Amino acid sequence: MIKTLFVFGTRPEAIKLCPIVLHLLSRPEEFQVTVCVTAQHRAMLDQVLKVFSVVPDYDLDLMQPGQTLSQSTSRIVAALEPVILETRPDIVLVQGDTTTTFCGALAAFYQHVPVGHVEAGLRTHDLAQPFPEELNRVLTGRIASLHFAATKGAASNLTAEGVDPRAIFITGNSGIDAVLQIRDRLDLGDLPQTAYPWRDPRKKLILITAHRRESFGSGIESICRGIRRLAVRGDVQIVYPVHRNPKVAGPVQQLLENHANIYLIEPLEYVPFVELMRASHILITDSGGVQEEGPSLGKPVLVTREKTERPEAVKAGTAVLVGPDEHRIFEQASLLLDDPLEHTRRSLVHNPYGDGHASERIAAAMCSFLR
């Protein structure tokens, strides 16, 4: 019996860890599962937990308005210590690159508990992009005993840093497990008119997400100007679930509100967001998860960042780096809108991030490593 403690706190972590939680729970003779959430992102975390019917054993509820990174880091590490001492796990599983990820790994390290890092080995090799995520994942990688890399490229990053190859397992990305499970629940066809009464199925839908810290200020403003130029076309509808952070919502509202063909909506729960991705013609995003999910749904992705820790989609052709640059956004989106062959070429490439079976591979790796 392997005693496994999951630690996570945000929506992206929950999306990528819940499929693993459910898989381990389906094998009760092999795994004892404990789930601890920090609630770094309270509302959006709860939405995902509900979708996957995962009930935390520990809810630390540490989110406070206006917390600095230093404050949240110290509070999370301190709050996790008694949880680890009480549960005495054989392994602590963390995912990705959030403050909770690093704090979960650090708290486990302080108690001499091995750490398994899901989605290990992503690197931009620039600590400022993304900030603070690049440092979080580098430090988590130094602490981890088990590294679950989604791709060969991520595994190569780890070996280049001196990680023992025997501790690296190429599993695919568990986020693909999640999106394929949700996709199979959805009805076919366009978006429901009740939820999106403005939707005209004759027009091509463009989905926007942008929330990265490194894009705050001039970056978000430039992205918005590119979107505004695209909206002049009569054959598109642009939908933007706007992040609640004032540094995002402020310029977005100022530059895009009340423009024809642009629809600013509230942040979406996970299932409606997957539904919206599936109905879209193009995805324009700075999100790491959307860069992975887009290829699974056959959607070309324009990445509004100068660097990405997920180069596989760029190499495969399904994603293009356009930066927070209004001209590149407009040019690349126009190409996909005007050239059906180019759109098809970018939509049909093989998804480099996984096949929906990462959870099983992660479970098998833990069994071989810990027994």
Where are these regions (language model features)?
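Nucleotide-activated sugar donor-binding and catalytic core shared by glycosyltransferases
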Residues: M1-Y240, N245-R371
